[in-house]
C-alpha cells in the first residue's frame, strides 16, 4: 500500500498518496488550486513549497512548483497566492485606436465586472474568430477616459487570423467574450524592493499596468523600465514612458534594436544589453518574445532575483495564439487606478 501524505495548502489540509499529482489530489479532495492549461505553460498553478518533498514541475523561481506537473513525495506545507476568481464575461468593443505602425489599442466595455491583478491575462474571443490571449492594461493617455473598461494592446501580425482584421472586420460594436484572469506574473503588493520591468513590443501592456499600479501604491518606489522595439517607429509607448519619467524614482530606458539615428535618450541594441545590474533584492518582471524572457530569466536567476515572466510564445510555438501581451513621462498620477486588483466595470 502506498504511503499516505498530509498536504497543507494555506489553511486547508487533505490526504494524498505518495506519487500523486498535486493538482489532481487537491481537486479530488475538494481543495481548489487555480489552474488553466494543465501542461505547465500558463504558470497559474504555481505554488510555494515551505516544507516537504515534491518532485517535478519545478517553477522558474526557487522554492516553487507547478501543481499540474509535480508529484507528492512526503508531507507538504504549501502556500498559494489568493487570486481573483476565473470568470467568463461578455462585452463589446467601444473604441479602436492605432498606436503604432503595427499596434492597435482596443477598448472593451464588459457587461459584468471583471477583476484582475496587474500583469495577469485574459482569453479573449471576438465573435466569429478564434480566441487569443491578451493582457488587460490601462489607457496610455486621456483618449480613453473610462479607466474601468478593459484595454488591450494588440500587435497585428501579417498572415494572422485575428489581429489583422481588427479595425476592418472587427470594429466598434463587435461582440467579445472574455475568460480569466490567468497567470501568476502579477505585481506583488506592499513590496519595498526595486522593481525592474523589461518588455518588448506589446509586452509593454502588462508592464505598463504593473508600473501604474506600483507608482500609485508607492510613488517613491524605485522602478527601472526597459522597453524595447525593433525601430523608432515601433516604439509606440513613448507617451506612456514620458508619463512615468515624471516620477523621481522611476528610470526609463527605451531601446531600439535596429541601428539608426535616434535621440540621445533612446539606446540602440538588444534589450538585455541595457538591463541594470541586478541583485537578490530586486523584483523583476519580463514580457516579450520567448528568447527575451529566457534571457532575462537567466540573468535574474544568476543575481538571485525573483523573476515573473510572461512569454509571447507557448511551448507549442503557436505565435498568434498568444499574439497579445501573453505568449506572453507626463502623468497625472491621482487619476490612475492601480495597486491590488483592477476592476473592469459594467457600463
Q: Model regions: which residues?
A:
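Residue-level "contact hotspot" at macromolecular interaction interfaces
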Residues: 15, 36, 115, 168-171, ...
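Short conserved beta-strand and strand-loop elements enriched in small hydrophobics
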Residues: 6, 78-80, 122-127, 174-180
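Ferredoxin-reductase
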Residues: 88-175, 193, 229-231, 255-259
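Residue-level marker of beta-strand positions
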Residues: 21, 28, 44, 121, ...
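Short, surface-exposed secondary-structure boundary micro-motifs
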Residues: 50, 81-83, 127, 157, ...
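Iron-sulfur (Fe-S) cluster-binding segments and ferredoxin-like electron-carrier domains
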Residues: 7-8, 14, 24-34, 43-85
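FNR/FR-type flavoprotein reductase catalytic core
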Residues: 147, 158-347
Amino acid at each position: 500500500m502506498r504511503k499516505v501524505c498530509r498536504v497543507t495548502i494555506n489553511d486547508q489540509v487533505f490526504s494524498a498518496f505518495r506519487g500523486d499529482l498535486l493538482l489532481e489530489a487537491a481537486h479530488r479532495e475538494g481543495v481548489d488550486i487555480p489552474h488553466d492549461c494543465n501542461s505547465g505553460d500558463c504558470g497559474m498553478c504555481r505554488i510555494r513549497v515551505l516544507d516537504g518533498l515534491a518532485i517535478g514541475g519545478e517553477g522558474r523561481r526557487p522554492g516553487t512548483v507547478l501543481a499540474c506537473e509535480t508529484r507528492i513525495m512526503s508531507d507538504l506545507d504549501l502556500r498559494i497566492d489568493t487570486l481573483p476568481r476565473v470568470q467568463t464575461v461578455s462585452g463589446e468593443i467601444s473604441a479602436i485606436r492605432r498606436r503604432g505602425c503595427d499596434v492597435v489599442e482596443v477598448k472593451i466595455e464588459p457587461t459584468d465586472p471583471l477583476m484582475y491583478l496587474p500583469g495577469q491575462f485574459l482569453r479573449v474571443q471576438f465573435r466569429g474568430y478564434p480566441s487569443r490571449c491578451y493582457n488587460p492594461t490601462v489607457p496610455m493617455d486621456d483618449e480613453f477616459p473610462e479607466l474601468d473598461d478593459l484595454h488591450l494592446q494588440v500587435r497585428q501580425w501579417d498572415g494572422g487570423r485575428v489581429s489583422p482584421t481588427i479595425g476592418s472586420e472587427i470594429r466598434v460594436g463587435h461582440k467579445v467574450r472574455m475568460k480569466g484572469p490567468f497567470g501568476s506574473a502579477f505585481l506583488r503588493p506592499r513590496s519595498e524592493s526595486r522593481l525592474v520591468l523589461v518588455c518588448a513590443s506589446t509586452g509593454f501592456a502588462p508592464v505598463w499596468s504593473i508600473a501604474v499600479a506600483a507608482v500609485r501604491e508607492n510613488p517613491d518606489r524605485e522602478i527601472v523600465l526597459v522597453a524595447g522595439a525593433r525601430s523608432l517607429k515601433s516604439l509606440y509607448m513613448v507617451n506612456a514612458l514620458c508619463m512615468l519619467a515624471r516620477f523621481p524614482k522611476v528610470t526609463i530606458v527605451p531601446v531600439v534594436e535596429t541601428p539608426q539615428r535616434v535621440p540621445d535618450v533612446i539606446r540602440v541594441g538588444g534589450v538585455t544589453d541595457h538591463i541594470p545590474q541586478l541583485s537578490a533584492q530586486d523584483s523583476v518582471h519580463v514580457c516579450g518574445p520567448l528568447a527575451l524572457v529566457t534571457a532575462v530569466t537567466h540573468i535574474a536567476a544568476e543575481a538571485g532575483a525573483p523573476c515573473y515572466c510572461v512569454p509571447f510564445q507557448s511551448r507549442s510555438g503557436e505565435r498568434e495564439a498568444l499574439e497579445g501581451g501573453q505568449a506572453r513621462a507626463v502623468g497625472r498620477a491621482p487619476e490612475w487606478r492601480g495597486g491590488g486588483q483592477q476592476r473592469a466595470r459594467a457600463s
